[in-house]
Amino acid sequence: MAVSFILLACFLSVASAQNSAAIISSSSLKPYEEAIIGFRSFFRDKDMDVSFSEYSLDNQEQDKVCREIAERKPDVVFILGSKAARLAKERIGNIPAVFCMVLDPSAVVNANMTGITMDIPVSIKLKMIKRLDPRLRKLGLLYSRESMDKYEEIATACQEMGLALSAKEIVLQGDIPDAIKEITAKVDCFLMIPDPKIYFSKSIEHLLLEGLRNKVAVIGLSSFYTKAGAFVSIDCDYRDLGWQCGNLALRIFGGQSPSTLSVERPVKIKYSLNRLVAERLGIKVPPELLREASEIFGEGE
């Protein structure tokens, strides 16, 4: 009985103490803001007293951010984006951290970090493609040595789902235009994968133009690509990403080390559609899928 009373007293003491979190965002773009809202709302909904300090690397000097965080000594740092993750790893790695919206976590995180990747399971993407238009059966993609694992995952999933896959490895960036032309000439759907070596402004523009020219449905990585001319983009729900990160931070508040908390995948997925592109591709999107879309572009244009 005495032991139980002591444990209960310790729990109440921890629960009543105010926890603190520093939030470092790589920029002030809307997706980052949505994730921050989700992170804050997690604790608000649980009636937890958490003090927050926010920093955006868009408009604040990195030296000042690091200095203030060192002075505040928060219980956890919530980091959004690769730039913020790199800063946290190099200069404030002694404080437990939770990350999200980092394309390649292995390159910028350390043992004192955990978080949520942006890696949406391939099976979810392929099933969504089939829902949008069952006629899309020939899938194309480009990959590099850095995204080889993702290519192999997609190849396995395509085989399991009876989809044909045409893929090409990119060694030199100068090979990208010809590779796009070659692949889009023999597929009806092109799946973009996270790989900064392949996808940058000029290559994305070239892909979207070739997609329309060859009536190939381009599947993008976020609504940015849909607005620019992709048929659809399957994306994370950023507010829910923040919520998931809040759950990880809660466990750190409770005494768990980030090294004991597995990096997780997104739980909630959303997608955006471009109706004008769909019309040009001859794809008639079912009304129920239009209703489910988080954003629709190309209406009335």
Task: Label each region the model flagged.
Residues A2-F11:
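Bacterial N-terminal signal peptides
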Residues A17-E301:
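Short hydrophobic alpha-helices and adjacent helix-cap/hinge residues
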